[in-house]
C-alpha cells in the first residue's frame, strides 16, 4: 500500500509516505512557507498504488506544486530545479581564441529587429526588418555542447525578368498576396549571369535576376507564388542553410571553426554549455577529419496501463503512462570503447567512464513507490501521471541528449507522451528542447496519415490503436536532438519474419528479453511495490537492449557519413529519402560551374519540408500530406534505387513498337497525361524537353528458359550498371539536346539513343561538354576507391569502421541517381535520361548475350581460357535435352563419346545479370576462369567504366520463371534462391520446412536429381503409362509424411503461423475479406493488443466449423471435438488463394423457400473465415485446418518443381502432384479405436 498524501494538496514539510519520513530538499521552496501561485492540474493515479491490489483510477485536481521523490527526498518539479542524481557538471569559463567544434544538427529561424534575444549591434544589422539565423548545434573537442548562431545568410532564388526595377515592384506586390502569416522583409534584385543545367547550351539564361530576400519564410512563399503564376524561376526551394553550406563550403556533419564571435552569457537562446554569435563569413569548415567527439545519447521506453484492460490509447484519459525507463550513455570519441565497439568490456559500449548522468546511467520513472530494481539504478517516484511526465521532460531537458533512440518511439512512445502532455494536461512540450519556442524551438511529430485516429475509432469503437501512421513515414523533430528509432532501422537492415525487439536482440545481440505480457503489466503494477519493480525491470531491459542495438548496428555513423557527403542535415538523411540527397549534391556541383537548377510547377504538389521556423505550431503532433517524390524512410538508405515501375499496360508490359519476343519488361513508363498506374506529370516542359510523350521500358529481362539444369550455370553481372552508363555515355541534364536549343556542328559529337517506340534522345559527347552527373559520379567513385584502399591498410578498428560507413554512403548515393531522374513527381525529373539509361542497359544485355552465343561454344575461343582437365569428357549424346528419356531400363543410349564438346547458352537475363548454361565444362573451371571471361567481354564490347564481372557458378539450377530461381552455388553451403516461398515472409515454417526438405533431396541426392531430369523429358501419357522415375519417389514420401503430420496433429502451432503486413489504416482497406484484417477485428473485439501500421499480422487457419471469436463479439463457448478433421479420398483442388468470394448460396428451387444451406467442403472455406490469432489457438486448443495447410504444401512444392513436371497442351502442372500422390483416408477420432495399422509403400 502506498499512502499518497498529495492527492488532497497542500501538504508540506515532513509528510509521511508509506511509513517513510520525507526530508525536504535543502534550499527548496517548502521551508519558506510561501508557495508561488500554481495552476491546478489533474492528478491521475492507479488506485492500486495507494491500496495494494485494487483496480481503477483516482482522479483529483490540485493546486499544489508538482512533486518528485528521489531516495526518500521530496523535490519540487520546476524549470530551475537542480536534478538530484549525480551528474558531471559542465562548468565552462570564458572561451578565448578560435573555437573548433563538431556540428551534428542545424536549424534555421527568422528573427525580427525587435527580437528580445541578446544580439549585439554587429549582428542585429542583419535583422532589419527581419533576417535568417542559422543555429549550429554540436560539441567542442573537450565534449562541451555548443550552439553557434550564424547571422547574415540571405535567402535567394533566380527569376527571368527583363526589368530589374519592375521585378522588385512585382515582388512587393506578390508579398501582399501570399498566404498568411505575412511578415516584414527586405528584398534586393540584381542581374545575374548563370546557365540553366537543363538542356545543352553555351549561352547564359537571358534577363536573369537574382532575387535576395532577408526572410526565408516570405522568400519561399513569394517564389512558390511566382512559380504557380508561370514565372520562369530557379532554385526557389533552396533554404538558407543549404545556401550557407554550398556557398561557404560548410559541412552539415563534421568539424567547423569560428574565428570571430560574440560570447553570449546573458539572454541565451539555447541551453547549451557554450553559445556564441558570428557572421556568416566567420564560419569555416575543417576538412579531412571524420572523427567524432563524445555525444550524449538517450535510450528510453515507456509502459502504459489501459483503464479498460485493452491496449492503451493516448487519447483516452484513463490509459495512463505508469513508467518510463532511460539509459544515458555516450557515443563517439577516439577509442573502441567510445565508439561502442566491444574491446574487452561488456560489449555494450558503456563503461563506468562513459556514465555522465546518474550512478550507472540507468534511470526509472514510476508512479508510486517501487522496490529494488537493480544495483545503482536511479528510481524517481511520482504521485501521479502528470508529475511523472513532467519529471521525464525536465530530465530530458537537463540531460540534453544529442541522439535519442528507442524502439518504435516515433510511432508510439514519443507520440504517446506528447499526446498526453499537449491534449490532456495542456503542457507546451516544445519548451523542453534545447531552444525555447520563441527562438525556433520545436518538439513535435509529423505524420502523413490525416484523420487516421478518427477513422480507426469509428471502425472499432471498442478498440484502441497505438500507431496512426506508418512507422517509416512518421518524422520527429526535436531542436538540438536527433531521433533515431531503431525499429525502422532494423526493418531496413534485416530480412526477418517479424521485427519485434526480442527477435532483433536475438539476431544482433544473441540475447533474449524477459517478456511480460501487456495484460500482466497492470496486475503486477497495482499489486505492490515489488510488482512495480518487476514492471520496472521489464521496462528498463528494453531501453538497455535498444542501446546495445544502437551501438551494434552503428546506423548513426552511416547517416553521418551520408549527411557529410550529401550536404544535408542528419535529420533529413533519416527522414527525407534519397531525392534531397541527390538534389543538394547536384546543386553543389552546379554552383562550381555557374549552372542553376530550374523549378517546375506541378499542380497538387506541396513544398518539401525544410528546417525553417517562422511560427511554431502549438500542437505537438502535426498531420500533413506527404511530400511527393521525397517521402522517404530509413530503409531507403540501404537499398539501390529500383527501376521505375508502373501498372502494366494492356500489352502485358511491352511498350508499343518493341516488336521483340525475346524480352519483356516489368513496366511501361510515359510522360504526359496518358501515363498509367497513377504515374504522371503536368503538361510543362520538364518531361522530355518539348517531346510530346516518352514511353520506355524498365527492369529489362530476357524470358528465362524454364527448367532444371544439372549443368553448371555461370552468372555475370554489370558493376554499378546505371551509374556506369551515365559516366560512359555522358548522360546529363546539361548534355541533353532539346528542341529549339543549341546543336553541335559536327554530327559525330552527338550520341543518340532510340527507344522501342521510335523516339530518339540525343546527348552531346564529353568532347563537347562533360556531363555534370558524370563528373559528380566519377568524383564519388574515385573517392570510394580511395576509401576502400585506406580500409585495407587501416589497423585501427574505429578508423576502419568510420571508413566503411563512408564508402557505404558513397555507394548508396551513387546508385540513387537513376531513380532521381526517373521519379516523375520527384525534385528534378528527366525521363529522357531515365529512358536512355534503361534502353542502353537493355542493349548491353542483348550484346552480351549475342557475344556469348557466338564465341563461348567455339573451340578456338575456349582454348584461350581452359585447359584439358577443365572439360567434362565422355558426355553422352542422349544427355541433350532434345532427346527423350524414358524411365530406367527403357532408354535408348547412343553410347559415349570422348569428344570435348562445350555448349554455352544464355538462359536468363535480369536487369544487370546474365545467366549462362555451360555443358562440357566443370564448375571448378568456370569459377577459376570466370573473371577472365568477364574481362574479355568487357574489353570487346564496352567502354569504361562499364564493367562486366563474374559473380558465381550454380552447380545445379532450377529456373522457375522471371525473378524466381533456386540453385546450389559452387563452393558454398546451402541454396541460393530468389522469389520462392522459402524466402517470403508470408509462408509458414511448416510449409518452408517441407519445401526445404524437397529441395535438399533434389539438389543433394544424385539419384533424385537424375530422376528430375528424366521426369522433365517425359510426357504426361508416359508418366501415366510408366509412372514417375524411381528416384522421384523419395520426394513423394516426404509429401505423404507431411500430410500425415498435419492430419494427425503432429505439427506445432508455431510452425503453422502465416502473416501479412498491415500496410495502412484498417479502415482504408476496401476488402474486408482478408485474413489479417479479420484477425485484427477479432483481436479488437476481445480488447487485445493490436498491431501497428507496418507490422506483420500473424494468424493460423483453423478447422471449419470452429467458432472463433466473431467480429464484433466475444467467444460464445461453443466446443469443438478435438481431433483430426475428416478428409475426402482425393485432395480437393479448389483454389483458396483468393481470400474473397466463396459465399454460400441458398439452395433454392423455383419459388420454394430457402432450404437449409449446404455445408461447404473444408477446402472451399475462405481463409478470412477461419483465420485466428496464434495465441488464441494455443490457449483454447483450436484444431487447425489440415486441408488448407496441405494444399499450401502442394502449391509451394509445385512452385519450385513445376519446371520438371510433364508439360503439354493437356497437362496441368498444378494438378500433377494430386495425380501421383497415393491417396489416404484420415479418420475422425471416434473411428480410430476400430482401425487397423497397415504398412504402406510409397
UniProtKB/Swiss-Prot annotation:
Enzyme class: transferase
Reaction catalyzed: DNA(n) + a 2'-deoxyribonucleoside 5'-triphosphate = DNA(n+1) + diphosphate
Record's signal peptide: none
Region (Disordered) residue spans: 14-38, 644-665, 877-898, 1108-1163
Molecular function in Gene Ontology: DNA binding; DNA-directed DNA polymerase activity; nucleotide binding
BP terms from Gene Ontology: bidirectional double-stranded viral DNA replication; DNA-templated DNA replication
Record text on subunit structure and interactions: Forms a complex with the ssDNA-binding protein UL57, the DNA polymerase processivity factor UL44, and the alkaline exonuclease UL98. Interacts with the putative helicase-primase complex composed of UL70, UL102 and UL105 proteins; these interactions may coordinate leading and lagging strand DNA synthesis at the replication fork.
Gene that encodes it: UL54
Compartment(s): Host nucleus
Coiled-coil intervals: none
UniProt entry keywords in alphabetical sequence: DNA replication, DNA-binding, DNA-directed DNA polymerase, Host nucleus, Nucleotidyltransferase, Transferase, Viral DNA replication
Bias-annotated ranges (Low complexity): 653-665
GO cellular component: host cell nucleus
Family: Belongs to the DNA polymerase type-B family.
Listed Polar residues bias regions: 1110-1119
Sequence ranges of Basic and acidic residues compositional bias: 1145-1155
EC number: 2.7.7.7
Role: Replicates viral genomic DNA in the late phase of lytic infection, producing long concatemeric DNA. The replication complex is composed of six viral proteins: the DNA polymerase, processivity factor, primase, primase-associated factor, helicase, and ssDNA-binding protein.
Protein's UniProt name: DNA polymerase catalytic subunit
Source organism, top-level taxon: Viruses
Amino acid at each position: 500500500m502506498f499512502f499518497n498524501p498529495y492527492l488532497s494538496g497542500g501538504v508540506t514539510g515532513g509528510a509521511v509516505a508509506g511509513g517513510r519520513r520525507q526530508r525536504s530538499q535543502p534550499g527548496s521552496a517548502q521551508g519558506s512557507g510561501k508557495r508561488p501561485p500554481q495552476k491546478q492540474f489533474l492528478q491521475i493515479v492507479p488506485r492500486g498504488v495507494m491500496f495494494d491490489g485494487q483496480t481503477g483510477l483516482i482522479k483529483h485536481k490540485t493546486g499544489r506544486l508538482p512533486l518528485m521523490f528521489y531516495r526518500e527526498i521530496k523535490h519540487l518539479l520546476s524549470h530551475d530545479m537542480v536534478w538530484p542524481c549525480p551528474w558531471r557538471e559542465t562548468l565552462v569559463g570564458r572561451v578565448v581564441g578560435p573555437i573548433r567544434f563538431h556540428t551534428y544538427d542545424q536549424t534555421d529561424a527568422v528573427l525580427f529587429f525587435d527580437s528580445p534575444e541578446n544580439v549585439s549591434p554587429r549582428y542585429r544589422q542583419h535583422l532589419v526588418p527581419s533576417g535568417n539565423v542559422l543555429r549550429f548545434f554540436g560539441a567542442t573537442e573537450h565534449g562541451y555542447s555548443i550552439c553557434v548562431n550564424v547571422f547574415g545568410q540571405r535567402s535567394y532564388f533566380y527569376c527571368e525578368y527583363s526589368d530589374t526595377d519592375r521585378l522588385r515592384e512585382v515582388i512587393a506586390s506578390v508579398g501582399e498576396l501570399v498566404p498568411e502569416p505575412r511578415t516584414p522583409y527586405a528584398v534586393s534584385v540584381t542581374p545575374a549571369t548563370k546557365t540553366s543545367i537543363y538542356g545543352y547550351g553555351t549561352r547564359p539564361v537571358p534577363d536573369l535576376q537574382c532575387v535576395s530576400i532577408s526572410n526565408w519564410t516570405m522568400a519561399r512563399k513569394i517564389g512558390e507564388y511566382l512559380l504557380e503564376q508561370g514565372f520562369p524561376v530557379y532554385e526557389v526551394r533552396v533554404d538558407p542553410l543549404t545556401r550557407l553550406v554550398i556557398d561557404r563550403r560548410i559541412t552539415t556533419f563534421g568539424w567547423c571553426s569560428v574565428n570571430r564571435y560574440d560570447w553570449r552569457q546573458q539572454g541565451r537562446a539555447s541551453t547549451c554549455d557554450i553559445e556564441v554569435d558570428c557572421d556568416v563569413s566567420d564560419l569555416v569548415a575543417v576538412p579531412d577529419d571524420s572523427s567524432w567527439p563524445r555525444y550524449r545519447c538517450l535510450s528510453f521506453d515507456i509502459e502504459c496501463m489501459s483503464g479498460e484492460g485493452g491496449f492503451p490509447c493516448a487519447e483516452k484519459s484513463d490509459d495512463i503512462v505508469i513508467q518510463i525507463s532511460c539509459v544515458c550513455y555516450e557515443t563517439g570519441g577516439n577509442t573502441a570503447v567510445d565508439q561502442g565497439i566491444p574491446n574487452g568490456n561488456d560489449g555494450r559500449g558503456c563503461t563506468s567512464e562513459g556514465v555522465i548522468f546518474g550512478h550507472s546511467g540507468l534511470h526509472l520513472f514510476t508512479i508510486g513507490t517501487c522496490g529494488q530494481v537493480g544495483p545503482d539504478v536511479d528510481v524517481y517516484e511520482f504521485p501521479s501521471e502528470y508529475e511523472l511526465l513532467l519529471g521525464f521532460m525536465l530530465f530530458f531537458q537537463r540531460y540534453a541528449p544529442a541522439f535519442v533512440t528507442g524502439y518504435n518511439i516515433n510511432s508510439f512512445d514519443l507520440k504517446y507522451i506528447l499526446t498526453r502532455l499537449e491534449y490532456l494536461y495542456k503542457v507546451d512540450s516544445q519548451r523542453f528542447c534545447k531552444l525555447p519556442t520563441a527562438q525556433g524551438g520545436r518538439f513535435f511529430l509529423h505524420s502523413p496519415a490525416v484523420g487516421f485516429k478518427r477513422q480507426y475509432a469509428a471502425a472499432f469503437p471498442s478498440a484502441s490503436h497505438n500507431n496512426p501512421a506508418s512507422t517509416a513515414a512518421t518524422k520527429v523533430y526535436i531542436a538540438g536532438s536527433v531521433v533515431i528509432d531503431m525499429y525502422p532501422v532494423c526493418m531496413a537492415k534485416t530480412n526477418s519474419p517479424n521485427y519485434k525487439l526480442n527477435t532483433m536482440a536475438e539476431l544482433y545481440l544473441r540475447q533474449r528479453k524477459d517478456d511480460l505480457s501487456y495484460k500482466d503489466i497492470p496486475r503486477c503494477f497495482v499489486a505492490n511495490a515489488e510488482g512495480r519493480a518487476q514492471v520496472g525491470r521489464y521496462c528498463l531491459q528494453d531501453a538497455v537492449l535498444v542501446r546495445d542495438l544502437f551501438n551494434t548496428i552503428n546506423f548513426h555513423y552511416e547517416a553521418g557519413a551520408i549527411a557529410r557527403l550529401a550536404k544535408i542535415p542528419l535529420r533529413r538523411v533519416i527522414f527525407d529519402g534519397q531525392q534531397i540527397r541527390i538534389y543538394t549534391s547536384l546543386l553543389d556541383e552546379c554552383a562550381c560551374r555557374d549552372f542553376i537548377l530550374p523549378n517546375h510547377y506541378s499542380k497538387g504538389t506541396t513544398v518539401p519540408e525544410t528546417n525553417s521556423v517562422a511560427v511554431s505550431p502549438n500542437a505537438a503532433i502535426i498531420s500533413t500530406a506527404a511530400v511527393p517524390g521525397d517521402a522517404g524512410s530509413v530503409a531507403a538508405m540501404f537499398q539501390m534505387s529500383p527501376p521505375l515501375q508502373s501498372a502494366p499496360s494492356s500489352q502485358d508490359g511491352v511498350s508499343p513498337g518493341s516488336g521483340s519476343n525475346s524480352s519483356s519488361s516489368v513496366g511501361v513508363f510515359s510522360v504526359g497525361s496518358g501515363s498509367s498506374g497513377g504515374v504522371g506529370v503536368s503538361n510543362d516542359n520538364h518531361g522530355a524537353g518539348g517531346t510530346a510523350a516518352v514511353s520506355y521500358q524498365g527492369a529489362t529481362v530476357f524470358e528465362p528458359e524454364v527448367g532444371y539444369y544439372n549443368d553448371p550455370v555461370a552468372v555475370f553481372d554489370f558493376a554499378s550498371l546505371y551509374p556506369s552508363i551515365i559516366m560512359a555515355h555522358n548522360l546529363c541534364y546539361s548534355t541533353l539536346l532539346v528542341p529549339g536549343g543549341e546543336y553541335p556542328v559536327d554530327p559525330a559529337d552527338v550520341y543518340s539513343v532510340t527507344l522501342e517506340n521510335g523516339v530518339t534522345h540525343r546527348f552531346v559527347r564529353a568532347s563537347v561538354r562533360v556531363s555534370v552527373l558524370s563528373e559528380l559520379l566519377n568524383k564519388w567513385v574515385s573517392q570510394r576507391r580511395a576509401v576502400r584502399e585506406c580500409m585495407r591498410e587501416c589497423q585501427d578498428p574505429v578508423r576502419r569502421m568510420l571508413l566503411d560507413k563512408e564508402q557505404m554512403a558513397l555507394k548508396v548515393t551513387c546508385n540513387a541517381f537513376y531513380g532521381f531522374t526517373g521519379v516523375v513527381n520527384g525534385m528534378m525529373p528527366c525521363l529522357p535520361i531515365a529512358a536512355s539509361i534503361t534502353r542502353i542497359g537493355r542493349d548491353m544485355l542483348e550484346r552480351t548475350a549475342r557475344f556469348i552465343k557466338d564465341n563461348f561454344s567455339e573451340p578456338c575461343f575456349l582454348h584461350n581460357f581452359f585447359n584439358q582437365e577443365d572439360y567434362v569428357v565422355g558426355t553422352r549424346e542422349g544427355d541433350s535435352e532434345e532427346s527423350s528419356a524414358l524411365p530406367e531400363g527403357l532408354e535408348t543410349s547412343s553410347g559415349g563419346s570422348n569428344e570435348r564438346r562445350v555448349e554455352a547458352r544464355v538462359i536468363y537475363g535480369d536487369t544487370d545479370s546474365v545467366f549462362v548454361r555451360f555443358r562440357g565444362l566443370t564448375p571448378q573451371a568456370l569459377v577459376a576462369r570466370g573473371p577472365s571471361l568477364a574481362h574479355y567481354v568487357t574489353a570487346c564490347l564496352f567502354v569504361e567504366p562499364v564493367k562486366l564481372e563474374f559473380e558465381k557458378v550454380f552447380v545445379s539450377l532450377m529456373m522457375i520463371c522471371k525473378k524466381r530461381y533456386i540453385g546450389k552455388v559452387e563452393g558454398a553451403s546451402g541454396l541460393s534462391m530468389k522469389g520462392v516461398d522459402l524466402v517470403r515472409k508470408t509462408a509458414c515454417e511448416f510449409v518452408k520446412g517441407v519445401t526445404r526438405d524437397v529441395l535438399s533431396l533434389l539438389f543433394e541426392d544424385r539419384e533424385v536429381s537424375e530422376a528430375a531430369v528424366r521426369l522433365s523429358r517425359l510426357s504426361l501419357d508416359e508418366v501415366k503409362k510408366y509412372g514417375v522415375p524411381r528416384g522421384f519417389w523419395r520426394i513423394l514420401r516426404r509429401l505423404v509424411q507431411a500430410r500425415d503430420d498435419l492430419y494427425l496433429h503432429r505439427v506445432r502451432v508455431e510452425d503453422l503461423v502465416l502473416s501479412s503486413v498491415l500496410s495502412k489504416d484498417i479502415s482504408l482497406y476496401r476488402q474486408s475479406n482478408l485474413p489479417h484484417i479479420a484477425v485484427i477485428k477479432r483481436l479488437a473485439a476481445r480488447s487485445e493488443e493490436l498491431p501497428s501500421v507496418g507490422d506483420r499480422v500473424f494468424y493460423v487457419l483453423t478447422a471449419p466449423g470452429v467458432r472463433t471469436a466473431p467480429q464484433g463479439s466475444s467467444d460464445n463457448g461453443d466446443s469443438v471435438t478435438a481431433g483430426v478433421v475428416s478428409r475426402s479420398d482425393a485432395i480437393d483442388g479448389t483454389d483458396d488463394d483468393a481470400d474473397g468470394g466463396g459465399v454460400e448460396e441458398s439452395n433454392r428451387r423455383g419459388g420454394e423457400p430457402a432450404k437449409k444451406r449446404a455445408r461447404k467442403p473444408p477446402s472451399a472455406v475462405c481463409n478470412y473465415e477461419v483465420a485466428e490469432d496464434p495465441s488464441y489457438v494455443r490457449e483454447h486448443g483450436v484444431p487447425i485446418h489440415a486441408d488448407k495447410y496441405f494444399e499450401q504444401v502442394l502449391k509451394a512444392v509445385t512452385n519450385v518443381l513445376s519446371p520438371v513436371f510433364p508439360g503439354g497442351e493437356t497437362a496441368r502442372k498444378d494438378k500433377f502432384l494430386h495425380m501421383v500422390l497415393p491417396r489416404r483416408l484420415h479418420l475422425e477420432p471416434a473411428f480410430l479405436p476400430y482401425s487397423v495399422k497397415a504398412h504402406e509403400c510409397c
